Amino acid sequence: MTKRAVLVASFGTSHLDTLEKTIQPIEWDIAGRMPGRVLRRAFTSGMILRKLEERDGLKIDSVPQALERLAEEGFEDVVVQPTHIMNGEEFDKLMAQAEPYRARFRRLAFGRPLLTTLEDYRDLTAALSEALPEPEADTAHVFMGHGTEHFANAAYCQLSYMFHDQGRPDVLVGTV
């Protein structure tokens, strides 16, 4: 029987309550959609990993550590599913870190970030628009992202455009 796993890779968070309220439910949802696979977690942010270990004694694997552990435990079929929003710097880093492990598995597959195709943008803006109240005069809804020097920062402009294209000029997308 082939040992199969799904490795959910997130940027991470240093707030344990946020981990429980956001990342963990996403991991469980992904695992629920992939029966027969063992769920594992990895964070891509070295700063977050160090902070959690130093402050809380919580050891979470980096992507290379998690893949090494899976290989040592005899897993043959691994899907790496990022929780990243876009194909930016952290996703590029994840892919670069994972590539050397490809030969260690019979199959190493990768999911994609939330916003990869034009259809992804349409789906997300439609879902968020449905969750928002109807537009009102002098009212705006603001979604904030972290922002990046990476060319993927254009994803925020695309998201803003899609909201406006779908009749939601009251929705603003910005970065810090």
Residue ranges: model-predicted function:
Residues 1-176:
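Active-site-proximal alpha-helix that buttresses catalytic centers in soluble enzyme cores
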